[in-house]
Every structure is written in C-alpha cells, then in structure tokens.
Design a protein with these regions (language model features):
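Active-site bordering "gate/hinge" segments
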Residues: 23-344, 364, 482, 492-575
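Hard-cation-handling environments
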Residues: 352
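Glycine-centered positions within short beta-strands or beta-hairpins
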Residues: 74, 357-358
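Bacterial signal peptide processing site
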Residues: 15-17
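C-terminal motif of bacterial Sec signal peptides marking the signal peptidase cleavage site
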Residues: 11-13
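Dual-mode signal for accessory low-complexity, basic/Gly-rich regions
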Residues: 345-346, 361-437, 441-446, 512-525
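Internal helix-turn-beta structural module
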Residues: 417-541
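Sec-dependent N-terminal signal peptides
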Residues: 1-6
Length: 576
C-alpha cells in the first residue's frame, strides 16, 4: 500500500460523534496524484499510450475497444468534452489494427446543429465542481417528468434557494429547450438506433462515460450494439492506466469482492468523515443481492441497487441474466452518512440521519445542497406513496438506494471533469464508495426494458424516476458478517479494497510486472485532519473546495508533494 501517514485525529473527531472511529492516532493512506499524466501535444505522442488501449477487451460498464475485430466498422459517439487530438489518436490506433472507425457527435445523432449544441452547453455548464450544490438542480431537471412545477413549488417556498439552483442565466429559450430535450438519453438512444439502421455495416457504438445500464436500455431493441463506454477521450484519461489495465486482474479483484455476499447477514460501514451505518439481511435479501451485485467497475454493494432489475451476467457481461430480482424485502439502513462530495462537486460537510425504518429522517449541514435536500423532503406525495414493487410499509422515496464500490486502482480525480462540473470519474477508483438516496427501478418482471410501471407512476404523481443526492467517501471501512461462519470479513479497509491484497490476485498481477505497482492506488484525496496535517472540522469540512483547489494548482504547476510514483525533481507544467 506504500507509505502511510499517521494523523492525530482527536480534534478531527470532535463534532462527529456518529463516527465509531476512536479519537486516537489512526493511520490513513497518504495523499497521491498520478505523476505520469503529462499533457500530449501531438497524435504521435499519444499513440504509444492508446495502442495498448485499443487492444484491451475489458472496459468500464461494457467491453473495451479491443472487442472490435479487424475488418469491422464501429462508431465513437462523442460527447461535448471530447478532445479532437485524443479522439484522433484513438481512431488511428484502431485503424492500425484494421478496425474502421466513424466519429459522430451526440448532437449529430439527433439533428441538432453544432452552434445550438455549443450554445446549450455554455448555458447549462455555467458552473464548476466548486458549486457541488448544483447536483440538486440536476436532480430536478433530469428526474422529474415535469420539472417546472417542482421549480415553481420551491420558488414559492424559498425564492432565495430557487435563485441559487435555477438562476436566470441558466434559463433556456424555447429553441434551446427543444435542444435539451433532443439531447436527453432516451432521444439520443432513438437517434443512435436510426443511425445504426442507416448504417448496417457498423457493428456497434462506443458511447458515454457512465451509466452503461441506462445507455443499453435506451438502445432497446438494439442493445447488443452497445459495445461499451467511450471514456478515454481527454488528455487526462488517455495518459492514465485506465484503458490499458489487465482485464483479468481487474475481473479477479471484483470476483473476490463479490464472493462472500450470498452468505452475508449484516454489514457495517464507518468512515473518518463521520459515516457510521449498518444493516441486517435475511437469506432472501442476500441471495438477490449476490445475483444482482455486478456491474464492471461499479459494484452494487447494497441490495436495493441490485434489485428491481435483471442482474448483469458476470460470465457474459454486459448481457443480462434471465431472472428478475424483486426489490422487496427492502434493505433497511441504520445510522448516519456523512461527507463533502457528490457527483457534481464539493459542499460543506453534511450528515444524513436514517430512521429505524431506513428512511431519511434528518439532514444536518451541507450548505446549499443540504438546504435543497431538506426542502425537497417535503415535496407533495414524495413521502406518502409507495413506489411500484414496494410494499405499503415502505411508502416514500427517501430510502438509501446506492452503496457502490469503485474497483479500479488507477482511476483518479480528473481536473477536466471538475472544470465541467462533474466529480464522477473519481468514484471509479478502488475503495471509493459513492452513496445515493431515493428509488429507481430498471426493469419490470419479464421485460428487459425501462420499467413502464415506474414511468407511469412517476408521470401520474410527478415524482422522481431515479436516485440522486450522492455522497462520496474515501477512507471507509466496509465489513460484512457471514451468517453460518459467524465471522466478519473486511472488504474495504480505510479506503483500500482488500481484494487487491489477495494472494491469488497478486499472483496473477505478477504476470504483468511488479504487483505492488500494478495494485497500488495512484490517486488518493488530500483531506486535512484525516491523511494530511490540519483540523478536519475547521480546515476542511466547511469549505472542501479550498483544499481541492490548492492541490489542483500544485499539480498543474508540477510542484505537488505527493506525486506517485514520485515525480522528477524538476517541476513540470501540464499545459492545462
């Protein structure tokens, strides 16, 4: 695991009484940032990095680029942040091995002009990850069948809060509202299907940077032509080890993590930022959880996310299994969730307290996003109706839906993403847990398409169709209790995915080089009072962005103290 920094946590533990961590000297892994992420300036400079990438058949939430065979034609569906230099290099490397590649922008798939797409993007991406509270705005705009009444409800109650979440400079003209509608996943899916029908020579598409389940579903009945995500489209990711990591090592790490779940009757999670939660499971819950846990790079480590759907096949991934997994009996969480980061960015520390029934009972702190959550907890019908496939004893929306593990040791905090208002890439790193509140259902029984019962229910009552209000935790300890063995197993230890240290995993990794290097995390966040000098409660929790920005500036200047592997003594510029 490399060097570990010992930090005295007495002061940091003050005010976080829900943490089970003892206020004594507890060791957490020291900060890191990859030292090898040097900016390329030409396609020739990028090619040595992408040639292994285009042969790798294992990818996040789908296949890697290597699943395309010589003589075939595939299409890269490009998002708005894709960098021409990087995409051009990946295309050339694919064509070197005999695969023809088409490049099509998302906006082209749905008949939107480049000018309109750029205008829409500039208005909607009017914030960075410094404004993590904007996840609350995205939750409304992306998840409600009719967002405008929800915005109006909030403006009537809290006009000050509505102005922060939905400022006038982000309002769309009727023309740009049409653009927005066309660029939503369901319509993009229809556009890509039309494209594939017009181009039968194209085997399939690489599309998107996350949400593989949703992307495949929106391509129905052509989901088999979703080949995988197109993640490595920017200078940060392409110079990383994300796309070239040995797939069999990654798969074995995930297999070892999932193995105990069918035998689990209890789990606990603690984290030095204040999370302390636990849950009990009966045999039916454990069985369904074990069958639905898998998604490559994103393990569903709480039964609620693994159910209400057809689970992924581990052997034939990304194909679905044949068995629909019921949501009930619902898994019930107890305790407190705490953190300072969501999928959009950073915010003052919050605590989410769950009732004995596993429902969100109280939210403390969180700044603007905390205020938003407290308000939206009072939305009409959101607490008094049972969602489809939920028992009447489980009315309401505000349950814990997601505890998901990242599993890739070389994933990292991507600064391009932070510029664009997304902290999503970091959640892929092994041992990082991301948590999500709410309810969604992917499928109805017997049909592997989007749940029509969910769509009908949420349309009738104008309720959210998906989960949201995420929290990222980085130094968690996640333990499960085995029912028949009466033994505890630690799956994450202070942010370290323990399967990375499994003897079988290390033996396999040794075939590719030094297992210590291959299985090491190359990025870890710097958090004062936890793994860096300072006081968590005063130096970090009220304004985490301050620390993050300091790290960004040092990395970009080439002067960061925690480059890993250690950088050359001379400072380097990233050209960012």
């Amino acid at each position: 695991m490399g060097a570990i920094v010992a930090i005295m946590l007495y002061a940091a533990a003050c005010g976080r009484s829900n943490s089970s961590e003892s206020p004594t000297a507890i060791q957490y892994p020291e900060p890191r940032y990859p030292s090898y992420l040097k900016p390329p300036t030409s396609i020739d400079e990028v090619l040595p990095h992408v040639r292994p990438l285009v042969r790798n058949k294992t990818g996040f939430q789908g296949g890697g680029l290597g699943v395309a065979q010589p003589g075939e034609t595939v299409t890269f569906v490009l998002g708005p942040e894709a960098e021409d230099l990087i995409v051009g290099a990946v295309k050339r490397a694919m064509e070197e091995r005999g695969v023809h590649v088409n490049l099509v922008n998302e906006y082209e798939m749905v008949g939107v002009s480049r000018a309109d797409a750029l205008e829409y993007r500039n208005i909607r991406r009017s914030y960075t990850s410094e404004q993590g509270y904007m996840e609350a705005a995205t939750w409304v705009e992306a998840n409600f069948p009719r967002p405008d009444p929800v915005k109006a409800w909030l403006r009537e109650r809290r006009p000050d809060l509505a102005d922060k979440l939905f400022p006038k400079n982000r309002e769309l003209s009727p023309r740009l509202r049409e653009v927005q509608e066309k660029l939503l996943w369901p319509n993009l899916g229809k556009g890509i299907q039309a494209y594939l029908k017009q181009h039968p020579e194209v085997r399939g598409v690489f599309w998107g940077k996350g949400g593989g389940t949703f992307l495949r579903r929106n391509l129905h009945p052509m989901e088999d032509r979703f080949l995988g995500l197109f993640v490595v489209d920017n200078r940060w990711d392409v110079m990383s080890m994300l796309g070239t990591y040995p797939g069999d090592v990654w798969q074995l790490v995930e297999d070892q993590t999932m193995e105990p779940l069918i035998h689990v009757d209890k789990m606990t999670v603690t984290d030095p930022e204040g999370t302390n939660v636990w849950a009990d499971f009966n045999e039916e819950q454990a069985r369904n959880w074990a069958r639905g846990v898998y998604q490559r790079g994103h393990l569903y480590m709480f039964p609620n996310q693994a159910t209400g759907r057809f689970g992924y096949s581990v052997v034939e991934y990304p194909a679905f299994q044949k068995e629909w997994l019921p949501r009930e009996p619902l898994a019930v969480i107890h305790g407190t969730l705490a953190g300072t980061v969501n999928h959009t960015g950073f915010f003052p520390r919050w605590e989410i307290h769950f009732t004995d029934n596993g429902y969100v009972g109280e939210v403390k702190g969180g700044g603007v996003v905390g205020e938003a959550l407290r308000e939206y907890m009072q939305l009409p019908h959101i607490n008094d109706l049972a969602y489809p496939f939920h028992n009447e004893t489980h009315k309401g929306y505000w349950y814990l839906y997601e505890i998901a593990f990242g599993t890739h040791p070389k994933a990292f905090r991507n600064f391009t993403g932070l510029d664009e208002g997304t902290a999503i890439p970091e959640r892929l790193r092994s041992g990082v847990i991301h948590w999500g509140l709410g309810i969604t259902l992917h499928h109805d029984p017997g049909v592997q398409t989007q749940s029509q019962k969910l769509l009908d229910f949420t349309a009738e009552y104008n309720l959210p169709r998906d989960h949201g209000f995420h929290t990222h935790t980085y130094f968690s300890t996640y333990r499960v209790h085995l029912r028949n063995a009466d033994r505890w197993v630690t799956l994450i230890d202070r942010g370290r995915l323990t399967s990375l240290d499994n003897a079988e995993v290390r033996a396999l990794a040794s075939r590719y080089g030094n297992p210590d290097q291959l299985l090491a995390e190359d990025w870890r966040p710097e958090i004062p009072g936890i793994n860096a000098p300072g006081n968590y409660d005063t130096d970090y929790a009220p304004d985490p962005w301050r620390t993050v920005k300091l790290v960004i500036d040092k990395v970009l200047a080439g002067t960061y103290e925690h480059f890993y592997p250690p950088a050359a003594a001379a400072p380097r510029s990233t050209g960012h």
